[in-house]
């Protein structure tokens, strides 16, 4: 280490991998002025847009998607891995990396293998309740293994939460509420339901909540619904003087959305749970009904602290909204209890914690002084 710490972030592909990496990048820059930050990605991932937007350097390698079934891709996998590892080793040398922080996904696997070959220390962060293949490999030779939850299947881990952007972790919902409600056209004293299904929306959530629009309006509940840019939403004609149902394809200001809402209906991807709990927003989580069940596991900690409910996608219906969500939204005491439970399970300092660990590891490996505080 030549005085300037160089960090390689391996978290490309989906927003669930890129966003935590960018949150940690921001924390690193705040903690260690002059730190050199490089993100690793591929031309296929969201990082090609998200990383430059945040002002960080991006280096691209050959994509190594892990096939989910037998195909020609499986036969080509070893060749792709070797090529991606070779490219990553060259990048590690070029940027003089002192530490690699991996967040899982197909960019992380070659990063871990290359770092091991180049003797660059590794820090692994797992956001999901069930770890994927890349992090299972990386955890075997990482200096530190950090996780959002206690048992993601990586052996001994340090629970730190999932890094989220500072606009969320620093959000004061109560202080911003009046501005947020004015922004979306809600009354100051409205009860507001926030509905969103991630960056692409969720058709089942869209159909169910829009199908319950009349029941929600009859109960005096306003709705803020992000239905996804690729989807459409059909709503009944509003009753004169009824509460607004604000439907938009995408919410560019999630901080305002969280501040305006009293309750959310959403999926339970790792980033969604991390953000919703960080701001202390009660939620009804509807796990995506595919994969290995990790979304249900992601929601378990907040359910255990009383900050949320879980309902299966197959059980979500307009009748469920009328029978369960409406009474919940009109019960001030229960909402207050759930708000406290959501905040209890949330982690607002995860990005800073991961950044501290990475800087410590880099300095320890270089024989420098321990600690950056």
From Swiss-Prot:
Instruction: Write down the CDD domains for this protein, in alphabetical order.
Output: GT28_MurG
Locate the residues binding UDP-N-acetyl-alpha-D-glucosamine: 14-16, 128, 165, 199, 295
Provide the E.C. number(s) assigned to this enzyme: 2.4.1.227
Query: Topology versus the membrane, per the UniProt entry?
Result: Peripheral membrane protein
Recorded metabolic or biological pathway in which this protein acts: Cell wall biogenesis; peptidoglycan biosynthesis
Compartments (UniProt record): Cell membrane
Specify whether Amino-acid biosynthesis is a keyword of the entry.
no
**What are the protein's GO molecular function terms?**
UDP-N-acetyl-D-glucosamine:N-acetylmuramoyl-L-alanyl-D-glutamyl-meso-2,6-diaminopimelyl-D-alanyl-D-alanine-diphosphoundecaprenol 4-beta-N-acetylglucosaminlytransferase activity; undecaprenyldiphospho-muramoylpentapeptide beta-N-acetylglucosaminyltransferase activity
One GO location term (cellular component)? plasma membrane
The protein's matches in InterPro entries, at most eight in alphabetical order, are given as: GlcNAc_MurG, Glyco_trans_28_C, GlycoTrans_28_N
Keywords annotated in UniProt: Cell cycle, Cell division, Cell membrane, Cell shape, Cell wall biogenesis/degradation, Glycosyltransferase, Membrane, Peptidoglycan synthesis, Transferase
What is one Gene Ontology biological process annotated in the Swiss-Prot or TrEMBL record? lipid glycosylation
**Which NCBIfam families does the entry mention?**
murG
Please explain the role this protein plays, according to its UniProt record.
Cell wall formation. Catalyzes the transfer of a GlcNAc subunit on undecaprenyl-pyrophosphoryl-MurNAc-pentapeptide (lipid intermediate I) to form undecaprenyl-pyrophosphoryl-MurNAc-(pentapeptide)GlcNAc (lipid intermediate II).
Q: Report what the protein is called.
A: UDP-N-acetylglucosamine--N-acetylmuramyl-(pentapeptide) pyrophosphoryl-undecaprenol N-acetylglucosamine transferase
Q: Which organism is it from?
A: Mycobacterium sp. (strain JLS)
